Amino acid sequence: LEHAWSRALNAEGGVKTPDILPGKNGSTIQSATSEALGQKRYLAMFEFVEGSEPDQQDDLTGGFEELGEIAAKTHVHSIDWDRPEPFERLVWDLDTVFGQDATWGHWRDGPNIGTQTRQVLEQVETTVIERLTQYGRKPDRFGLIHADMRLANLLITDGETRLIDFDDCGLGW
Protein backbone atom coordinates (compact mmCIF):
# COMPACT_ATOMS: atom_id res chain seq x y z
CA LEU A 1 0.00 0.00 0.00
CA GLU A 2 2.73 2.48 0.87
CA HIS A 3 4.13 2.10 -2.66
CA ALA A 4 0.73 2.64 -4.25
CA TRP A 5 0.06 5.74 -2.16
CA SER A 6 3.53 7.18 -2.75
CA ARG A 7 3.05 6.78 -6.51
CA ALA A 8 -0.47 8.21 -6.39
CA LEU A 9 0.67 11.25 -4.42
CA ASN A 10 3.36 11.87 -7.02
CA ALA A 11 0.98 11.40 -9.96
CA GLU A 12 -2.23 12.94 -8.59
CA GLY A 13 -1.63 14.66 -5.27
CA GLY A 14 0.98 17.28 -6.06
CA VAL A 15 3.52 15.72 -3.68
CA LYS A 16 6.89 14.69 -5.11
CA THR A 17 8.06 11.26 -3.97
CA PRO A 18 10.91 9.00 -5.13
CA ASP A 19 9.99 6.40 -7.72
CA ILE A 20 9.83 2.77 -6.63
CA LEU A 21 11.92 0.47 -8.80
CA PRO A 22 10.51 -2.94 -9.70
CA GLY A 23 12.59 -6.10 -9.55
CA LYS A 24 13.26 -8.37 -12.52
CA ASN A 25 9.88 -10.01 -11.93
CA GLY A 26 8.09 -6.64 -12.14
CA SER A 27 7.10 -6.52 -8.47
CA THR A 28 8.09 -3.57 -6.29
CA ILE A 29 8.38 -5.90 -3.29
CA GLN A 30 11.04 -8.61 -3.25
CA SER A 31 11.95 -11.17 -0.63
CA ALA A 32 15.28 -12.60 0.40
CA THR A 33 16.56 -14.95 3.05
CA SER A 34 19.84 -14.47 4.85
CA GLU A 35 21.60 -17.09 6.93
CA ALA A 36 22.62 -14.34 9.36
CA LEU A 37 18.99 -13.32 9.95
CA GLY A 38 17.54 -16.79 9.68
CA GLN A 39 14.24 -15.66 8.22
CA LYS A 40 12.72 -14.13 5.12
CA ARG A 41 12.90 -10.34 4.76
CA TYR A 42 10.98 -8.13 2.38
CA LEU A 43 12.78 -5.50 0.36
CA ALA A 44 12.01 -2.51 -1.83
CA MET A 45 14.30 -0.29 -3.86
CA PHE A 46 13.71 3.38 -4.55
CA GLU A 47 15.35 5.65 -7.05
CA PHE A 48 18.27 7.59 -5.61
CA VAL A 49 17.22 11.18 -5.02
CA GLU A 50 19.81 13.89 -4.60
CA GLY A 51 19.15 16.31 -1.81
CA SER A 52 19.42 17.00 1.85
CA GLU A 53 17.03 17.55 4.72
CA PRO A 54 16.51 21.12 5.89
CA ASP A 55 19.48 22.34 7.93
CA GLN A 56 18.46 22.68 11.57
CA GLN A 57 20.99 25.49 11.99
CA ASP A 58 19.07 27.63 9.48
CA ASP A 59 15.80 29.50 9.92
CA LEU A 60 13.33 26.62 9.66
CA THR A 61 10.24 28.78 9.20
CA GLY A 62 10.11 28.07 5.46
CA GLY A 63 10.76 24.38 5.99
CA PHE A 64 7.87 24.03 8.41
CA GLU A 65 5.59 26.03 6.11
CA GLU A 66 6.42 23.64 3.29
CA LEU A 67 5.97 20.66 5.59
CA GLY A 68 2.50 21.99 6.44
CA GLU A 69 1.64 22.39 2.75
CA ILE A 70 2.77 18.83 2.03
CA ALA A 71 0.78 17.53 5.02
CA ALA A 72 -2.33 19.31 3.71
CA LYS A 73 -1.87 17.85 0.22
CA THR A 74 -1.44 14.32 1.58
CA HIS A 75 -4.53 14.75 3.77
CA VAL A 76 -6.71 16.01 0.93
CA HIS A 77 -5.46 13.27 -1.40
CA SER A 78 -6.00 10.47 1.12
CA ILE A 79 -9.65 11.38 1.72
CA ASP A 80 -10.75 10.61 -1.85
CA TRP A 81 -8.09 8.09 -2.86
CA ASP A 82 -9.36 4.60 -3.63
CA ARG A 83 -7.13 2.34 -1.56
CA PRO A 84 -6.00 -0.89 -3.16
CA GLU A 85 -7.30 -4.15 -1.74
CA PRO A 86 -6.27 -5.82 0.42
CA PHE A 87 -5.66 -2.84 2.68
CA GLU A 88 -3.48 -3.68 5.67
CA ARG A 89 -1.58 -0.93 7.45
CA LEU A 90 -0.70 0.12 10.96
CA VAL A 91 -3.38 1.93 12.93
CA TRP A 92 -2.11 4.94 14.90
CA ASP A 93 -4.85 5.36 17.48
CA LEU A 94 -4.79 6.03 21.22
CA ASP A 95 -4.09 2.38 22.09
CA THR A 96 -1.25 1.90 19.60
CA VAL A 97 0.41 5.17 20.58
CA PHE A 98 -0.22 5.42 24.34
CA GLY A 99 -1.50 1.97 25.35
CA GLN A 100 0.35 -0.73 27.28
CA ASP A 101 1.26 -2.48 24.02
CA ALA A 102 2.09 0.66 22.02
CA THR A 103 3.50 -0.12 18.57
CA TRP A 104 6.87 1.57 19.19
CA GLY A 105 6.95 0.95 22.92
CA HIS A 106 6.01 3.28 25.71
CA TRP A 107 7.47 6.78 25.95
CA ARG A 108 8.02 6.28 29.69
CA ASP A 109 10.69 3.70 28.80
CA GLY A 110 12.67 6.25 26.79
CA PRO A 111 16.15 7.32 27.83
CA ASN A 112 16.76 10.34 30.06
CA ILE A 113 13.17 10.79 31.20
CA GLY A 114 13.49 12.19 34.67
CA THR A 115 10.75 13.00 37.14
CA GLN A 116 10.12 16.53 35.87
CA THR A 117 10.02 15.47 32.24
CA ARG A 118 7.76 12.53 33.07
CA GLN A 119 5.28 14.82 34.87
CA VAL A 120 5.11 17.21 31.92
CA LEU A 121 4.73 14.40 29.38
CA GLU A 122 2.01 12.74 31.47
CA GLN A 123 0.05 16.01 31.39
CA VAL A 124 0.60 16.24 27.63
CA GLU A 125 -0.56 12.64 27.16
CA THR A 126 -3.73 13.29 29.18
CA THR A 127 -4.51 16.41 27.14
CA VAL A 128 -3.86 14.69 23.80
CA ILE A 129 -6.05 11.73 24.75
CA GLU A 130 -8.90 14.02 25.87
CA ARG A 131 -8.73 16.18 22.75
CA LEU A 132 -8.47 13.30 20.27
CA THR A 133 -11.34 11.49 21.99
CA GLN A 134 -13.49 14.62 21.58
CA TYR A 135 -12.28 15.13 18.00
CA GLY A 136 -13.46 11.68 16.99
CA ARG A 137 -12.64 9.24 14.22
CA LYS A 138 -14.93 10.28 11.36
CA PRO A 139 -13.43 9.60 7.91
CA ASP A 140 -12.57 13.27 7.35
CA ARG A 141 -10.58 13.28 10.62
CA PHE A 142 -9.10 9.80 10.90
CA GLY A 143 -7.66 8.31 7.74
CA LEU A 144 -4.52 7.44 5.86
CA ILE A 145 -1.51 9.40 7.15
CA HIS A 146 2.23 9.39 6.49
CA ALA A 147 2.86 9.01 10.26
CA ASP A 148 6.50 10.12 10.14
CA MET A 149 6.19 13.50 8.45
CA ARG A 150 8.99 15.66 9.79
CA LEU A 151 11.70 17.81 8.27
CA ALA A 152 14.17 14.90 8.28
CA ASN A 153 11.91 13.11 5.79
CA LEU A 154 12.03 15.91 3.25
CA LEU A 155 14.78 15.89 0.63
CA ILE A 156 15.44 19.23 -1.00
CA THR A 157 17.44 19.77 -4.17
CA ASP A 158 17.35 22.65 -6.65
CA GLY A 159 14.28 24.14 -4.99
CA GLU A 160 12.28 20.90 -5.28
CA THR A 161 11.16 19.00 -2.19
CA ARG A 162 10.41 15.28 -2.06
CA LEU A 163 8.66 13.43 0.74
CA ILE A 164 10.32 10.13 1.69
CA ASP A 165 9.94 7.29 4.22
CA PHE A 166 6.39 5.98 3.88
CA ASP A 167 6.97 2.72 5.78
CA ASP A 168 5.02 3.89 8.86
CA CYS A 169 2.00 5.14 6.92
CA GLY A 170 -1.30 3.94 8.29
CA LEU A 171 -4.60 5.10 9.70
CA GLY A 172 -4.54 7.94 12.18
CA TRP A 173 -5.33 11.58 12.86
Where are these regions (language model features)?
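ATP-binding pocket architecture of kinase catalytic cores
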Residues: 1-83
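Catalytic-loop of the protein kinase fold
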Residues: 141-146, 151
